[in-house]
Design a protein with these regions (language model features):
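Outer-membrane beta-barrel "beta-signal"
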Residues: 116-130, 323-349
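Residues that define the transmembrane beta-barrel architecture of outer-membrane proteins
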Residues: 45-47, 61-67, 111-119, 164, ...
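Glycine- and aromatic-enriched membrane insertion/assembly motifs of diderm outer-membrane
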Residues: 62-128, 252-257
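Outer-membrane beta-barrel transmembrane domain signature
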Residues: 31-33, 173-310, 316-320, 333
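Repeated loop/turn-to-beta-strand initiation elements of outer-membrane beta-barrel proteins
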Residues: 77-83, 127-132, 230-232, 303-311, ...
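Transmembrane beta-strands of outer-membrane beta-barrel proteins
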Residues: 48-54, 82-86, 133-140, 166-173, ...
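Short glycine/proline- and aromatic-enriched beta-strand/turn motifs that initiate or cap beta-hairpins
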Residues: 23-89, 175-182, 334-336, 349
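Outer-membrane beta-barrel biogenesis signature
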Residues: 22-48, 130-161, 234-243, 338-349
Length: 349
């Protein structure tokens, strides 16, 4: 005897099969012809300027989000350079440690805004092209609106050239931030008494401690870049373009210059008023830092005068020991690019 559950399952399977057959039997699924407009992966713009309205970073030292600016420059087929800056919009959006410090900190240390600077270059160890294929979606102007949203888009595989770059990366990283020392103490098994003043006395128990961290370091690593710059004209569809510049990379991070601000604490009397005469500075030296780290990332942009780009990376950043893990996502729009070549040949009559 067939139960209701079995009957319902059979109906669902039949419906799925009918949809699959219907999609495979589409009337517009016919062979297409095309004409190549260009296929030149070496003819890309030289300068790209990225405006980043939003990035987000899960960083154990300080969770943060904000805005940024980035620029990259390609020097012939030998080198490319990149400079990047980002910071938080405000302590509320989103500078977690700074915001928390201003709410609950018991120490007198100022709260540092999160700032991040990165600059470096990539040497093209091997820069070459090889035969490849790319998938292009087939689109008609008649697909606008609901028609496009209601259909599974067809795609065609187009032969093209892909440019590959094996790169060697080197650069510098500078960043500073507020940080929660209470969490660092938990990670390293420390107590308040481990922070001593000039008289050898420890910091009183129960004090919520926040400080600031500043680092200067280097990164060295490798990258692999794929560049396609191809356009074709289809006979019954709109022009297809694939101009993606995709880069993956892995870096070793080294920061020999890491500084933490010492703790400045002023005790309060029974009425909650600070006792200025008893203000003391306590050494932060008990907190261990980690000089080495790593990261892996991916970045994508398009070889167009006006477009957008994306990027993501994760790893372990040199910082307070045990507080270096991070994962970051960034979106850029708009991205302006140009080849910086406006000369044309002129001949006398």
């Amino acid at each position: 005897m067939i139960t209701g559950k079995q009957f319902f399952t059979a109906i669902c399977l039949l419906a799925f099969a009918a949809v699959a057959v219907g999609q495979d039997d589409r009337k517009d699924k016919t062979a297409v012809t095309y004409e190549e407009i260009y296929d030149e992966p070496y003819s890309i713009n030289k300068l790209f300027v990225h405006f980043q309205p939003l990035y987000g970073e899960l960083f154990a030292t300080n969770v943060n989000a904000g805005f940024g600016l980035e620029a990259s420059y390609y020097l012939n087929d030998k080198l490319d350079f990149k400079a990047h800056f980002r910071k938080t919009y405000s302590k509320n959006f989103y500078d977690f440690s700074r915001d928390l410090a201003q709410k609950i900190s018991d120490v007198d240390n100022r709260t540092e805004v999160y700032n991040y600077f990165e600059f470096g270059g990539t040497y093209h160890v091997k820069d070459f092209t090889e035969s490849s294929k790319t998938k292009m979606f087939l689109y008609k102007n008649s697909y606008k609106g609901n028609k496009w949203a209601a259909r599974v888009p067809l795609n065609a595989e187009i032969p093209c050239k892909v440019r590959k770059i094996y790169g060697a990366r080197l650069g510098g990283i500078i960043w500073d931030s507020s940080t929660d020392i209470n969490r660092a103490m938990e990670a390293q098994g420390l107590v308040h008494a481990d922070f001593k003043n000039d008289e050898g006395n420890g910091l009183p128990e129960g004090v919520d401690i926040f400080s600031n961290i500043a680092t200067k370091g280097l990164y060295v690593g490798g990258s692999l870049t794929w560049i396609r710059n191809v356009a074709v004209s289809f006979d019954k569809f709109e022009t297809g373009v694939d101009d993606l510049i995709l880069t993956t990379y892995f870096d070793i991070l080294v920061s020999p210059w890491i500084t933490l601000d010492d703790i400045v604490y002023t005790p309060k009397d029974a009425n909650g008023n600070p006792i200025i005469a008893d203000r003391k500075t306590y050494s932060i030296g008990a907190i261990k830092t980690n000089t080495f780290g790593f990261r892996a990332g991916i970045e994508g942009k398009f070889n167009r005068a006006l477009s957008w780009s994306y990027g993501a990376e994760a790893g372990y950043r040199p910082s307070v020991d045990g507080r270096g893990f991070f994962a970051m996502l960034k979106i850029s729009f708009p991205v302006y690019s140009t080849n910086l070549d406006y000369k044309v040949e002129a001949f006398g009559k």
